[in-house]
Amino acid sequence: MALKPPYSPESGGASRSRTQTETVHFWEYLESLLDAADCTSEAQVNSALVAYVKTASERYGEYLVEDRDFYRVALLLLRAPLYERNKSFCISKMLSLLSIDLLEMSMKFVISYILLCECKADSSSLDHVLDYQGFTVIYNKLYEHFAYLHRYSDDEETTFEANITELDEEINEELRKISTVLLDLLFQILKYSKCELANLQRVDDFFVYYMMVSLRSDTVEDMYNNAKFRLLLALNEQYMISNHKAGLENKVYAYLMNHTASKQFVELLLLQFNRTVDKSLQIMMCKIIYLILTSRDEIAMDYFYLNDLHVVTDVLIRNLTNISEDEEVLRNTFLRILDLILRKTEWTQSHYREQELLELLEYLCSVDNLCSSGNVKSEHMSTTKLAFKCRQAIRQLKVEQKKSRDAAAAPAPRPKTPEPRFERTDSHMSVPMDKITRAIGRSPFASPPPPPPSRRV
């Protein structure tokens, strides 16, 4: 016998707390909506799915409060035979519902959460999402939310200061909550599926700009903040890949070069780089740093504050020391970043932890220190080459520094006496007087000859 709904709208709705009995009845009723025996056609599957999502959405904030409640809703559906036999259709239907403009926020959240759980549980489902224009649907919803928050929230320091009421803030908080799930879903698509160029071209300047300027750099605990940061990393990675194929402009890099827009992002990047243990995110952050340090020399030299540069150096030393043998690719990535820091930043003046770096690089230059099993791989050889290159950069810098010191300490050379234009000789002083007399026909000391006689007229 079919169960009745937990309560009717006339019974007080969400205004009163529910008893344990009512809570149990709610979950039993919700599960009964997915009874596969009653669904033999696509239309019946459609009706059952819509009823399930609608019922869960109506109890949002009442029976569904904590993250575990929403996870249970998702798990009940994803494990139901009705869903497993009609997965592609169910995904297309949920995306269709999500694309509705005036869809209630509670239903947006429930659908987004179910789709995210599905894609994390089975990465092949990302293909189904993309087949049914999922990228466009998710991107458009996020764009709508960003446009609203840009205008009516205080997410940005430059936002127009409107009179934000308590109701406005409640709406903003719900939009951030839904956006957190959608951002994570879009991250899954960009990170773990083949991103079509057309989808990447759809991302416009405002979308990237809003995520960058609305970041907070004082926390790593805010889920909405972290979701925006991760999506920017994933977008940058896709731009770097597509640049080799189609020369598509990297919008993330463009705003990185705008210090006003990227200030919060760079501060959060350094904070996350120092704290995160997720290897995938570490590599993605290294790609951002690599882009910055391979810019023009004057940009790379002055982009990071000296203290921030020292933090990056500390993190690199720590990670290079602690990486295990099976993570040699990650060590190679860190060494490439270190090489750029040693050659193209203010480290060339500070020489921060120089001796420790030399000792570490000396250790990494030997394959025997990297591979205890004796099974030397190409990654191990790359590590030794990169370590040698970094070590040479430090040694070359020390040689140049010594030359500069020696040149500064050497005494200044004495100025040379300028050579006369004409050489002076005194040889005429030694010529005998009689020779001079004979040459001119008279003594140079005799009286001058008389004047010539006057001409007669």
UniProtKB/Swiss-Prot annotation:
Residues 446-457 have a biased composition (Pro residues). Residues 401-457 are annotated as: Disordered. It comes from the Eukaryota. Residues 416-427 have a biased composition (Basic and acidic residues). Keywords: Cytoplasm. Pfam families: SPIN90_LRD (PF09431). It is found in: Cytoplasm. The keyword Zinc does not apply. Belongs to the LDB17 family. This is Protein LDB17. It comes from Eremothecium gossypii (strain ATCC 10895 / CBS 109.51 / FGSC 9923 / NRRL Y-1056) (Yeast). The lineage of its organism: Eukaryota, Fungi, Dikarya, Ascomycota, Saccharomycotina. The gene is LDB17.
